[in-house]
Amino acid sequence: DKYIECDPEYKSIDSFLNSLPAAIGPIVYREGPAVGGLAAGKHVWAVGNKILVRALFWRKDIFQDAGLGPEKPPKNWDELIEYARRIADPARDKYGISMAGGAQSSWDFMSYLWSAGADAVTQDKKTGEWRAAFGTREAAVALDFYMRLATERWQDSDGTVQHGYSTLNSDERSVKLAQQAGKLGMYSQYLGDDRMGGEVDPALVGIAPFPAGPSGRGATEINATLNGIFAGIVGRNNSEGKFVPAEKIRDAAWKYISFMNSKRARKIYAETMVNLGQGRSLSPTYLREFGYTEYLKYFPPSWEQAFNQALENGKPEPYGRNCQMVYIYLTQPIDEAMQLFRDGKLPEGDSPEAKEKRLDMLQEILKKAENRTNARMIGHIEPQEQQKRTTVAIIVAIIIACVFCFVIYNIWKVFSPKDSYSGKKRGWDFKRNWLGYLIMIPALVSILLWTYYPMLTGSQLFFQDYRVVGDSRWVGFDNLAGVLFSDEWWSAIWNTFRYMMFTLTLGFLAPIVLAILLQEVSH
């Protein structure tokens, strides 16, 4: 905060926040823990530049080939799916719209989710806690439309049954090549405030806001480059061997950050681009700000309008505490819905009955995924359920400890030597074997130091919400409870057991059986 207030360009926190798009402000200025000598509360945690939004790109030549107006992008979802239908022709290697696949394909689904009026996560304004929130009817409507784009059954001109009008590809490189080769009619891509599509040929490619959904607006992702200073900076020696205090390192970091986010840096960038003959690729904002208005004639006004509308309607990616994995958790219900379609269990058709039943099924899938996300990603479990899980975890921990002690006791008994004459256990017999014990001391100390000490000190992670940076919190048996009630963990155990059985059966028993057969079978 003090750096912002002392900066000649910002001068105050309010002035700094006013310089940012409205959607970016809550990300950089929010509640946080006490760090770096600052009290817990609202602080500026980062400074951002290079604002990015996602917009809809379309190929004008493909639109024209499909009988669509090359200058008329889809304005709503009805037009979007109609355009995708008319463009899609797999026999000619043409696809209506590009959609991401893979383990985090829901990243591409977010635009549909937001445009339907739903959200992936929301924050409680009173408590500040984040919750998954995609188990709503609006989210089901978004998923239904997304599924239609990806799986709707239709026949191409050759009479072949096709599914969907999209690519659903997780390979970014192949998607990029398909864009360049003119195989994709529509796709979403980033627009930056520094170039704003300036590297795209406006005669071939159009840029528009994402089509409006049931909410009446088309909402896409807003992103930005955010720079912050590590709170745990400590003094250290530089490359010349001189000690540099932590405060001086922070000052140097801020000097770099403030310059990279300053008007001076933007001016240098604009001048350099113009001098290199790249003035046409600069955004209208930069061209006006630094007086290169002669290049504005090369820039379609609709592109700037698309950027501004996306900035107004868009939302930042989920940024709350523990929300980093939301795309993985949100992809799971999408995959479940896809599998239901493949299995023929998802009602098809546009009749009110089929659509209502389909939406009910999709919402049920999303609601289960929402509860799963809150429990596993956010860590929010109802107190009664948490108490039950903790009780089970304590019982299991006691059983494990008892079994461990029993096994160790029996191993100790087996390896404890007995006198061959009396049958009694022998003692340590230090007087007789002192030299042997002395020789063993270095080895024992080494084993204790490098094996058992790390194991004992590291085992405290079992009882902690461990943080690499910051304070780790003691959570008792909550970690064990989380594992015991995790479907993924039990699935991993089952898969490990199956792999072991296959390995033993095929790799160990099969050769033995084969050898016996070869030996016993008469020739």
Which residues make up each language-model segment?
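Extracytoplasmic/periplasmic substrate-recognition and gating elements
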Residues: 66, 130, 151-156, 198-284
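Glycine-centered hinge/linker elements that transmit conformational signals in sensory
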Residues: 81-86, 124-169
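Hinge/lid segment of periplasmic solute-binding proteins
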Residues: 1-55, 206-209
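Extracytoplasmic/periplasmic solute-binding protein
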Residues: 27-49, 54, 78-132, 138, ...
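Transmembrane alpha-helix signature in integral membrane proteins
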Residues: 392-400, 487-517
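Long, aromatic- and glycine/proline-rich binding clefts that accommodate carbohydrate-like moieties
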Residues: 29, 208, 270-339
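Short membrane-interfacial helix/loop motifs at transmembrane-helix boundaries
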Residues: 425-429, 447-487
